[in-house]
Amino acid sequence: MNFLAHLHLAALADSSLLGNLLADFVRGNPQGEYPPEIVAGIMMHRRVDVMTDTLPLVKEARTYFSADYRRVSPITLDVLWDHFLARHWDQLVPNCALPDFLQHAQSQILPHLPHTPARFQSLNAYLWSERWLERYAELPFIADVLQGMANRRPKLAALAGSFYAIEQHYQPLEDLFLTFYPTMMQQAQHKQI
C-alpha cells in the first residue's frame, strides 16, 4: 500500500493519520520519539505492509512482472494499489468523497509537520499542494510517479520500466485489488490490523 491506502485504512481503524503516513520516514523503534497515538499509527502502517506483502493475491500480482522488473514489483504494486483505490473511491467509500477525505487528512497532518523529519516535510510540500493523492486516479500520473522514483534512486531505475507490466496486465491487477482490498477495509474497521 502507498500513501492513500495507508491513510484510508488508518481512518477506518481510528488510527493516527499522521503516524500511518509518517511511518516510511521513521527507522527503528519509534517509542520515545513520538506520542503514543503516533507510534500506534506507525506500527499499524508496518503491520499493513507485512500483511499486504504476504497476501496470496499480492504474490499472484507479482507474477505479472517479468524477471527484469520483479525485484521492484512490490514498490510498483504499492503505487498501483493507490491508483485503483483513487479510481474506485466512490464505489469503495460511498459515504465520503475523496477530496473531502483528503482535506480532513491534510488538516490532521499539517499542524504537526514542524515535529517531523525534514524528508517528510518535503514530501508534504508536494503531496497536498499538487493533489498527488487525487491524481493517483490518473494512469499517466502513476507512470510519472514511478519515473520520478527511478530518477531519485538509481538502484530503483527498473521502476520506470515496470509500468509496462501495469499497461499489459491492468485488468487482472485491478481485479486482484478489488478482491483483496475490501477485506482489508473490514479488517481495519474491526481493528484486526
UniProtKB/Swiss-Prot annotation:
<dbReference type="GO" id="GO:0006633">
    <property type="term" value="P:fatty acid biosynthetic process"/>
</dbReference>
<keyword id="KW-0275">Fatty acid biosynthesis</keyword>
<dbReference type="Pfam" id="PF04336">
    <property type="entry name" value="ACP_PD"/>
</dbReference>
<dbReference type="InterPro" id="IPR023491">
    <property type="entry name" value="ACP_phosphodiesterase_gpbac"/>
</dbReference>
<dbReference type="GO" id="GO:0008770">
    <property type="term" value="F:[acyl-carrier-protein] phosphodiesterase activity"/>
</dbReference>
<comment type="function">
    <text>Converts holo-ACP to apo-ACP by hydrolytic cleavage of the phosphopantetheine prosthetic group from ACP.</text>
</comment>
<comment type="similarity">
    <text>Belongs to the AcpH family.</text>
</comment>
<keyword id="KW-0276">Fatty acid metabolism</keyword>
<protein>
    <recommendedName>
        <fullName>Acyl carrier protein phosphodiesterase</fullName>
        <ecNumber>3.1.4.14</ecNumber>
    </recommendedName>
</protein>
<keyword id="KW-0378">Hydrolase</keyword>
<keyword id="KW-0443">Lipid metabolism</keyword>
<dbReference type="InterPro" id="IPR007431">
    <property type="entry name" value="ACP_PD"/>
</dbReference>
<keyword id="KW-0444">Lipid biosynthesis</keyword>
